[in-house]
Amino acid sequence: MSIHSPGYTVRRIPVNNVTDTTMFILTGFTDDADLQVLLFLLFFVIYLFTLIGNLGLVLLVIGDSRLHNPMYYFLSVLSFLDACYSTVVTPKMLVNFISNDKSISYPGCVTEMFLFVTFGTTECFLLAAMAYDRFVAIYNPLLYAVKMSPRVYIPLIIACYSGGIMHATIHTVATFSLSFCASNEIRHVFCDIPPLLAISCSNTNINQLLLFYCVGSIEIITILIVLVSYSFILFAILKMNSAEGRRKIFSTCGSHLTGVSIYHGTILFMYVRPSSNYALEHDMIVSTFYTIVIPMLNPIIYSLRNKDVKEAMKKIFERNFFMNKVHFKL
């Protein structure tokens, strides 16, 4: 059976159980062909800025010796995560905007969901690790080099990734152990957990509980680490006599708190609530925001208010300007 819409045809394949499901159809935001072209252009520009901003920040940290410390190593890992996070979802979504074929293969859907959950969860843990790093640097700066040596921050980063992989494995196995009946249409732009559960004909109570308690536990743990770390940072700031020192700390920590608040706020809205409150159309917009828009915003949030990053960027621009000027004269 087919669904005819302006500009393209979407195939709907009736399925009886999970073994018959060889593909899914991602219905996306709209059937309007003109609007899809506009959405393609919008998200293409966002994705381009995301890659330039995040990968540029990674190269900046690698290339500038002044940024060779744990704080900026964590920031470069966050930027790499954001680039990967967006890349898992955006290219396929862009293709769907301009293609008649909106399908994604069953293995492709499994892979997309696994990577999406892996990078998303890893980012939650990494934001908590970054808060702890700021706490150590500000509350006990004399011991910072010892307490955040490579033997500490490298295992921390590995632990963040390990936690992300474990969490993704749980949900991927649980979700794709279900049967998918009647329709293979996913009312979403990518293979997220709630819309997949919505088209399953199996009992999804265990999956709903897993989603609520796993995501809820991760959110509680990581947010508590952030809150405790910043409570100690606040005490340290109140003891400071230097106004310049306070401004520098507020500049560094304010950007991190902004990023944490936006990211965790959208995740809590998406996953930590009763399944009866899910509205797939609204959730599609919110999930698009935190998978595509937030990765674009993070380089801006973390660089515009950071003096060291701005100086490193200024140094590169000045060097490139000088090189171009010399080349022009020659």
From Swiss-Prot:
Task: Give me any GO biological process, just one.
Answer: G protein-coupled receptor signaling pathway
Cystine pairs: C109-C201
**Cytoplasmic domain ranges by topology:** 59-66, 133-145, 230-249, 305-330
Under the heading Pfam families, the entry gives: 7tm_4
Q: Which GO terms describe its molecular function?
A: G protein-coupled receptor activity; olfactory receptor activity
Which UniProt keywords are present, listed alphabetically? Cell membrane, Disulfide bond, G-protein coupled receptor, Glycoprotein, Membrane, Olfaction, Receptor, Sensory transduction, Transducer, Transmembrane, Transmembrane helix
On the Extracellular side, which residues? 1-37, 88-111, 167-208, 271-283
Lipid bilayer topology: Multi-pass membrane protein
* Known glycosylation sites: N17
Q: Name one GO cellular component term.
A: plasma membrane
Q: Where does the record place it?
A: Cell membrane
In terms of InterPro entries, this protein maps to: GPCR_Rhodpsn, GPCR_Rhodpsn_7TM, Olfact_rcpt
Annotated transmembrane regions? 38-58, 67-87, 112-132, 146-166, 209-229, 250-270, 284-304
Output the SUPFAM superfamilies linked to this UniProt entry: Family A G protein-coupled receptor-like (SSF81321)
The reply on keyword Glycoprotein is yes
What exactly does this protein do?
Potential odorant receptor.
Q: Which family does the record assign? A: Belongs to the G-protein coupled receptor 1 family.
* PANTHER family per record: OLFACTORY RECEPTOR (PTHR48018)
Q: What is this protein called?
A: Olfactory receptor 5T9
The species this protein belongs to is Mus musculus
Which gene carries the instructions for this protein? Answer: Or5t9
